[in-house]
Amino acid sequence: MDKVKIALQYLMPKHLVSRIVGKFAAAEAGFVTTAFIKWFIKQYGINMSEALHSNPEAYKTFNDFFTRELKPGLRPIDQAEDIMVHPVDGAVSQLGPIEDGRIFQAKGHHYSALALLGGQADDAARFEEGDFATIYLAPKDYHRIHMPIKGTLSKMTYVPGELFSVNPLTARNVPGLFARNERVVAIFETDKGPLAMVLVGATIVASIETVWAGTVTPPTGKKVFTWDYPTEGPEALTLEKGAEMGRFKLGSTVVMLFAKDAIDDFADGVKPEAVTRMGQPFAKLED
């Protein structure tokens, strides 16, 4: 059965399906939207008591519901200076060292940091001998993405690609998954060197957004696009630890890359399959 599911993903017109779903998710369809939201809540066991607006009827579109805001104070940010926090609610897929420029995906599967970053060799070189962490956001999760540490935006890259599912089954069976799917790479300058936040698209992910550029995809293209940003002066964008940096409209995965010697060790309990909650300790930074 697993092989059938993977084969269907190769055959499915993934971009077309995702865009059709995206149009529905953005539509103000009244009672149809509300009925679908109620079904989705029940189907995935979503805890609406955490949402700022717990009544499904408060959301005009499915996208509004999916990117729902949490109640204030529900995800307190660990403010210790030597602590990096979880950027999202989700589950750790994999984490560890970047070895020979390669990142571990699942048993028998690796991919290169160079490919993940859209072939940007200068960017990939900055993460040699560093560390990575991959976090999967399930449909039930809160889908806003936050900063693990304070950083100043220096570059954004849009990388075209496939739209395979990014669930654990697919990660185990599709080689180079996260370097094959459409994605948005944001690079920040931090006190511990560069930080890459890679927002990976997936089947029926209607869009990827950032707080500085709005919707980055769609529309999609066939070329890699890059944007450079000033890191000093009045136009520089610095985001504090815990600040929102982006969001998915339907679930996906975040891959983070850290510079060599940025991380001393991952926090207790942070390992593959561990549940993550935004704002809680993720790693201890090097002194």
UniProtKB/Swiss-Prot annotation:
Membrane topology note: Peripheral membrane protein
Sample GO molecular function, one term: phosphatidylserine decarboxylase activity
GO CC annotations on file: plasma membrane
Pathway info: Phospholipid metabolism; phosphatidylethanolamine biosynthesis; phosphatidylethanolamine from CDP-diacylglycerol: step 2/2
Post-translational modification: Is synthesized initially as an inactive proenzyme. Formation of the active enzyme involves a self-maturation process in which the active site pyruvoyl group is generated from an internal serine residue via an autocatalytic post-translational modification. Two non-identical subunits are generated from the proenzyme in this reaction, and the pyruvate is formed at the N-terminus of the alpha chain, which is derived from the carboxyl end of the proenzyme.
Cleaved signal peptide residues: none
Main location per the UniProt record: membrane
Highest taxon in the source lineage: Bacteria
Keyword Lyase included in the entry's annotation: yes
EC code(s) of this entry: 4.1.1.65
Keyword Transferase among UniProt keywords: no
Cofactor: pyruvate
Alphabetic keyword roster: Cell membrane, Decarboxylase, Lipid biosynthesis, Lipid metabolism, Lyase, Membrane, Phospholipid biosynthesis, Phospholipid metabolism, Pyruvate, Zymogen
Entry's Gene Ontology BP terms: phosphatidylethanolamine biosynthetic process
Catalytic-site annotation from UniProt: 89 (charge relay system), 146 (charge relay system), 252 (charge relay system), 252 (schiff-base intermediate with substrate)
Chain positions with Pyruvic acid (Ser) modification: 252
Catalyzed chemical reaction(s): a 1,2-diacyl-sn-glycero-3-phospho-L-serine + H(+) = a 1,2-diacyl-sn-glycero-3-phosphoethanolamine + CO2
InterPro entries: PS_Dcarbxylase, PSD-B, PSD_type1_pro
Site (Cleavage (non-hydrolytic)): 251-252
Compartment annotation: Cell membrane
Family: Belongs to the phosphatidylserine decarboxylase family. PSD-B subfamily. Prokaryotic type I sub-subfamily.
Complexes and interactors: Heterodimer of a large membrane-associated beta subunit and a small pyruvoyl-containing alpha subunit.
Function: Catalyzes the formation of phosphatidylethanolamine (PtdEtn) from phosphatidylserine (PtdSer).
HAMAP family, sorted: PS_decarb_PSD_B_type1
Protein name: Phosphatidylserine decarboxylase proenzyme
Species for this entry: Shewanella amazonensis (strain ATCC BAA-1098 / SB2B)
Source lineage: Bacteria, Pseudomonadati, Pseudomonadota, Gammaproteobacteria, Alteromonadales
Gene: psd
